[in-house]
Swiss-Prot record:
It comes from the Bacteria. GO terms for molecular function: DNA binding; DNA-directed RNA polymerase activity; protein dimerization activity. Homodimer. The RNAP catalytic core consists of 2 alpha, 1 beta, 1 beta' and 1 omega subunit. When a sigma factor is associated with the core the holoenzyme is formed, which can initiate transcription. The N-terminal domain is essential for RNAP assembly and basal transcription, whereas the C-terminal domain is involved in interaction with transcriptional regulators and with upstream promoter elements. It comes from Bordetella pertussis (strain Tohama I / ATCC BAA-589 / NCTC 13251). Keywords: DNA-directed RNA polymerase, Nucleotidyltransferase, Transcription, Transferase. This is DNA-directed RNA polymerase subunit alpha.
Amino acid sequence: MSTQGFLKPRSIEVEPVGAHHAKIVMEPFERGYGHTLGNALRRILLSSMTGYAPTEVQMTGVVHEYSTIAGVREDVVDILLNLKGVVFKLHNRDEVTLVLRKNGAGAVVASDIELPHDVEIINPDHLICNLTDAGKIEMQVKVEKGRGYVPGNVRALSEDRTHTIGRIVLDASFSPVRRVSYAVESARVEQRTDLDKLVLDIETNGVISPEEAVRQAARILMDQISVFAALEGAGDAYEPPVRGTPQIDPVLLRPVDDLELTVRSANCLKAENIYYIGDLIQRTENELLKTPNLGRKSLNEIKEVLAARGLTLGMKLENWPPLGLERP
């Protein structure tokens, strides 16, 4: 079926509303496509954007989250809640452990955290706690890259680490998108008045811009539905493939970069000449664990993203690599 008769947006406008807040207006769409695409993009924006969050904390003199610290007005629960509000951005790394030390009366804010050159805090004035004259606070904060919302108890079980006294595992909300809504209005092209205008209202925490968030969401949506493109050209009648020439799923021809793995995992795979998803799924778990710098955590990440696409490790492919497949 040809799609040439379908209208595509001719106009995309970005209307700034405030800091990290914008309305993105796209028109025209065929009637009904405003809701179809608006709802899909909204769900992806809320659930699937990659961001950064504090995941573990260790405070000097603190055994558990229900403790109090002498000279600190807030209890540990309030300090942890405030710490979750700090917006971190990591450049070219997937995790980092940061140190916060301060004593003497006054407010402790996000800018008091000691940062390496490749870590940034978007809201440096964010309050963490208040100290009295004799107050002192010292802590280590682990920040990680992730997606969606991961409860602390789930992370603690999945990582299978030896429990350290005083190590507090946090519920992590990685999403950089704070709010998303969409509206569908009427649009007109020449004599047609039954068209849709899609208005996306997006607010982020500053790690990414609203425009970049939409671009990422669109790429995720395209990647997820690309598997259906294999049905194109089949016509109304089913034609079985010619014997001896197995058809290759187009998803397997996509680069591993499309899996949106962490930088560490992606670099480990490329070092082993694994450039395409088809290369990856033919490796076994044991083979990947022998890869330098690729540990159990990276392996679990790879298995999860493959499972989301209906794939597993250790699969066998005939006629791989296909003729003409370019290697970097």
